């Protein structure tokens, strides 16, 4: 019986040691200082859109980007028509986007497409941008989306991620 008590005690000590550090995380929300949100800066942004056969919806996204309350002179829209067999590139050009086309049947997927697009943007726009937005071609944004995200970025947050669990046609924050 003493052996079982000893084994039980050793196991309890091991669990106690393994999980005690987690109690340090309990006061973290109360100790964290709020970041000051000063006035938003005028940042230059590039909007990256990788599209494959999205001619039906890409015009809506570009129109919602052109309708932003954020200054259009600080916003550049780039579309990569990736292995398209429809008129995605033409629709995006007519809507006012900077369009690149890629035809590569070996390196297929959004990762390759984004890499291709960012390499071309770096070469064609050596001054670069302060930040980047990546959207799917079927998104549509609320008119103040970029302005509100700029306020977050200007407040010191370098990365923002939005997960849409119940998708609607309008992205908003």
Q: How does the language model describe each region?
A:
Residues 1-41, 94:
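N-terminal membrane-anchoring/stem segments of glycan-assembly enzymes
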Residues 43-46, 76:
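Cell-envelope/extracellular polymer assembly enzymes that use nucleotide-activated donors
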Residues 59, 86-93, 144:
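Acidic helix N-cap motif at the loop->helix transition within catalytic regions
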Residues 63-74:
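Short, acidic, metal-binding catalytic loop of nucleotide-sugar glycosyltransferases
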Residues 74-75, 89-120, 124-127:
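Conserved donor nucleotide-binding strand/loop of the catalytic core
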Residues 81-89, 104-106, 140:
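A conserved acidic beta->alpha catalytic loop
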Residues 87, 135-152:
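Acidic donor-binding/catalytic loop of UDP-sugar-dependent glycosyltransferases
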Residues 162-173:
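Single conserved hydrophobic/aromatic residue that forms the stacking wall/gate
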């Amino acid at each position: 019986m003493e052996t079982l008590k000893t084994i039980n005690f050793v196991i309890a000590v091991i669990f106690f040691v393994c999980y005690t550090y987690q109690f340090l995380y309990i006061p973290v929300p109360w100790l964290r200082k709020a970041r000051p949100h000063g006035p938003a800066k005028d940042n230059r942004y590039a909007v990256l859109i990788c599209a494959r056969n999205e001619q039906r919806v890409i015009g809506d996204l570009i129109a919602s980007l052109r309708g932003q309350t954020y200054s259009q002179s600080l916003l550049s829209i780039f579309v990569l028509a990736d292995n398209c067999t429809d008129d995605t590139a033409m629709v995006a050009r007519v809507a006012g986007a900077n369009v690149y086309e890629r035809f590569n049947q070996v390196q297929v997927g959004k990762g390759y497409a984004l890499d291709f697009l960012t390499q071309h943007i770096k070469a064609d726009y050596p001054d670069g941008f302060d930040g980047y937005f990546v959207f799917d071609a079927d998104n549509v944004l609320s008119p103040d989306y970029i302005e509100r995200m700029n306020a977050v970025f200007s407040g010191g947050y370098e990365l923002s991620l939005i997960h849409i669990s119940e998708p609607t046609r309008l992205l908003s924050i």
